[in-house]
């Protein structure tokens, strides 16, 4: 196959500059080696993520910038819940009108709030997170912000700067509430969502990410959640029964190590964190009761981050 431009999305003219003829482009489209988007825009098939559709929407929308959930995906941050059905763009308040196959938000976009990823204009990480916190459920916002803070992709100072500049925008109080709930120690979206759900269920507040040490002082592993008063550890497990056997075996061996140290292990997944809250509460309360009945004199030592 002939060389193609290094950008995510390109035109026939771009391909001609790379030595393609119009006939060759047409043949590649018919055979599926090139994908055709709106207004004559093209991309390679199989590119991971939503970039081709988003790039096509941005290119078709003068002054449009990828934002909100589309920006999360471009920045490699988690989207809790369904992915956006359409590319999400932000345009100037008096910018372009309705655009087919794109969801438009109208807002000011100073230069500091815009960056470029894979040749796509996109809102900065800090601006993206504040926008998501204003418009999406708190679970989605906190999971994305936790991931960015944990990965050191953004700082609280950068988020506060955007918040101050947007202090009078719609739904800014919603974003403020989300920012008060974030915790950079969470290592996965499921942990972030679970942390919120545990609070809503009025369960005791757990320690996050403590390291378990055995009698010799050797680190056995780090826990997602730990309730020291009960000797109970909580594992937010996003894996499924279809994951590789080696991974599942390693998880089982890890659980047995903790149980050998006298800990009660309670596991849950996305189903409990998103829909079966009462079942999660019952599972943890049962674990707390079992922990109360155990001899706690030999409990392992913990080192908290």
Model-derived features with residue positions:
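Short gly/ser-rich loop at a beta-strand->alpha-helix junction or flexible surface loop bordering the NTP-binding
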Residues: 1-173, 207, 288-305
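Surface segments flanking catalytic/ligand-binding clefts of nucleic-acid enzymes
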Residues: 6, 19, 112, 149-305
């Amino acid at each position: 196959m002939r060389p193609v431009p290094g950008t995510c999305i390109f035109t026939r003219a771009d391909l001609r500059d790379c030595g393609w003829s119009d006939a060759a482009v047409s043949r590649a489209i018919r055979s599926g080696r090139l994908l055709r988007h709106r207004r004559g825009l093209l991309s390679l098939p199989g590119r991971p993520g939503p970039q081709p559709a988003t790039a096509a929407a941005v290119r078709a929308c003068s002054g449009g910038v990828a934002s909100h959930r589309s920006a999360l995906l471009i920045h490699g941050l988690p989207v809790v819940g369904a992915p956006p059905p359409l590319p999400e763009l932000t345009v100037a308040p008096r910018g372009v009108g309705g655009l087919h196959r794109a969801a438009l938000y109208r807002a000011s976009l100073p230069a500091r709030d815009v960056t470029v990823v894979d040749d796509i204009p996109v809102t900065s990480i800090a601006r993206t997170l504040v926008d998501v916190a204003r418009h999406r459920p708190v679970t989605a916002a906190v999971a994305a912000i936790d991931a960015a803070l944990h990965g050191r992709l953004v700082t609280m100072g950068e988020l506060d700067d955007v918040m101050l500049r947007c202090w009078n925008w719609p739904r800014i109080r919603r974003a403020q509430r989300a920012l008060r709930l974030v915790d950079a120690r969470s290592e996965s979206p499921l942990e972030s969502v679970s942390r919120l759900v545990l609070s809503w269920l009025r369960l005791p507040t757990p320690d996050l990410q403590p390291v378990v040490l055995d009698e010799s002082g050797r680190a056995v592993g780090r826990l997602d959640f730990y309730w020291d008063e009960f000797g109970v550890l909580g594992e937010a497990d996003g894996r499924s029964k279809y994951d590789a056997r080696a991974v599942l075996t390693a998880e089982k061996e890890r659980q047995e190590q903790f149980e050998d140290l006298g800990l009660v292990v309670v596991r849950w997944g996305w189903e409990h964190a998103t829909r079966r809250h009462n079942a999660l509460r019952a599972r943890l309360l049962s674990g707390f009761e079992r922990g109360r009945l155990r001899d706690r004199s030999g409990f392992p030592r913990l080192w908290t981050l």
